[in-house]
């Protein structure tokens, strides 16, 4: 039976039924038939392949993804709000926990903003600046190793996963030697660093560089020389330069589309313009290109670390201004705040005024002139920006972060729609989102 009252009309939004009466059963039956294969699938937020508590809502037609959306917010910790209730130095202990795989980038971006407001950018000791670069490049290595290891694990390449975490452990051992902690260091402070490198640190660094140079070619053999790995990555998660620019994607996602945009070159900070290194790019616009870029960036990071070691001259690691500087020249105490017994004995033996000043500096903090600044660093995932606003007090009025994981995750839909369900995992892994940074 046919009826002129219910005629389906195909549009870009789907099939539209114009009904003016007649057989409703036929309308329903026709609609059900047209949407027979349409299924909504929730991938996550506890899915092992979504890099944390990320929820992906997928509309699939058979094996093809017709629509993809992100659900975020499951790891919201209120870090930006908490910063408004702590002094400027205490802020580093919060920001280091955002993207927990790149703590030194979070800390450095925040401290560069605070230093810009204070007007002390030119007063930061050279040794502190070189050590910041050194720590950031080590951190870039460890972040890329996790990305490659977890990406390999999700594809079933468990050997890459084991190798990646093996090498990352070497970096975390160095962090533990330098800062006392494997993660969440709060080592970069406004004005410099919490303390200097311990004895023997440079020798350990040289050993690490030698080991990593030996280990990096293994990833080439396991991945780039593996036809199954390449077939699984090539032409998957495709996003061209136009799409990257429209969605604000940065980092390896943007560079895989052929644009050599890297803030270390285009808008240098911490003296990066004086270092010799290349910005790797690809023209594949896919997950495989992003993988190759991260592999090459690790080699470039080793180059920069070697240059940092050559530039390490003896000197202070904190500004000379005692109204800002926390004690950095003495060993840290058990509380991790620079209040070692040596320091307490030193200031108590000097004068009561020095003791009062130290007490006020730690409890109340220093004042930052009113104003607002935006600073950005090139994190392993892309542009990590921070907008810092001061009202002239001892606490931030507002601190907002532009996290690259959050921005790049918007590209997930463009990468996945029209592809296979299995390729969603590869596309998300190539973005390398960390939910601590996305949700903050």
Swiss-Prot record:
Membrane topology: Peripheral membrane protein
Uppermost EC category: translocase
Keywords carried by this UniProt record: Cell membrane, Membrane, NAD, Quinone, Translocase, Transport
Location(s), subcellular: Cell membrane
Signal peptide: none
Keyword Protein biosynthesis recorded: no
Principal subcellular localisation of the protein: membrane
Subunit structure as annotated in this protein's UniProt entry: NDH-1 is composed of 14 different subunits. Subunits NuoB, C, D, E, F, and G constitute the peripheral sector of the complex.
Protein name per the record: NADH-quinone oxidoreductase subunit D 1
Gene name linked to the record: nuoD1
